[in-house]
């Protein structure tokens, strides 16, 4: 910051050259770092990992560290059950990179969730939510989206739905599923489940959706569109065990 650039042109016969001279001044460093977090749950999670923050007193001011910190906190909260958290709830304020003492304070604010109902925007406390119901829809297709599922199998807390007779053995199938009943919401488990189901190469589409039951519980739906050539079923050897 606060660098000076001097531009000069050297004119000669049939030739001209230009040069830039950049003078770097003293960089800005972080001074006090204050935090204002609306949610007690989120505040507790933040404090438990503050030692890993990219923003530390005495460190040089860098834009990229603010982006890294926002990404770190978003991943932390969304893998600790805070399903409704999004990066735009994090804001950084009171930053002055032109301060004469080359130090800047930082105020980080993390707000509660904002929701809209009937045109009114309200603030709702962020909560840790658990997954209480998991449905696996094994043969979804747009052409049959309005049809009722004829076959339903319940196994170990999961409900399997199929338009025709279920072609998969639930116990074997679940080796590729890392989302479990009673588990807190985690982005990592959602991504891992999607990855392993795609690795089976049985399904053309893999979608994982969540729906809020109440402020403490979520339901999860694993929606699968099979490839025709794999309509017979899943080979046990193709499953990656968890």
Region spans (language model):
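Immediate N-terminus of the mature polypeptide
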Residues: 1-242
């Amino acid at each position: 910051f606060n660098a000076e650039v001097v531009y000069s042109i050297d004119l000669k016969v049939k030739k001209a050259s230009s040069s830039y001279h950049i003078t770097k001044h003293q960089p800005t460093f972080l001074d006090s770092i204050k935090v204002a977090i609306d949610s007690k749950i989120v505040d507790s999670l933040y404090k438990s990992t503050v030692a890993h923050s990219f923003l530390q007193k005495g460190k040089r001011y860098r834009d990229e560290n603010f982006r890294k910190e926002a990404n770190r906190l978003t991943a932390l909260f969304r893998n600790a059950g805070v399903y409704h958290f999004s990066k735009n709830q994090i804001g950084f304020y009171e930053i002055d990179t032109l301060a004469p003492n080359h130090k800047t304070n930082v105020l980080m604010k993390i707000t509660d969730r904002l929701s809209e109902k009937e045109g009114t925007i309200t603030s709702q406390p962020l909560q840790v939510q658990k997954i209480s119901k998991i449905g696996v829809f094994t043969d979804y297709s747009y052409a049959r989206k309005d049809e009722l599922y004829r076959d339903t199998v319940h196994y170990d807390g999961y409900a399997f739905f199929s338009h025709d007779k279920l072609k998969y053995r639930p116990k074997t199938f679940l080796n590729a599923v890392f989302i479990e009943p009673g588990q807190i919401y985690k982005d990592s488990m959602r991504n891992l489940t999607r990855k392993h189901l795609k690795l089976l190469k049985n399904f053309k589409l893999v979608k994982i959706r969540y729906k809020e039951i109440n402020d403490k519980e979520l339901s999860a739906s694993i929606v699968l569109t099979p490839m025709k050539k794999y309509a017979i079923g899943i080979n046990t050897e193709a499953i990656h065990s968890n």
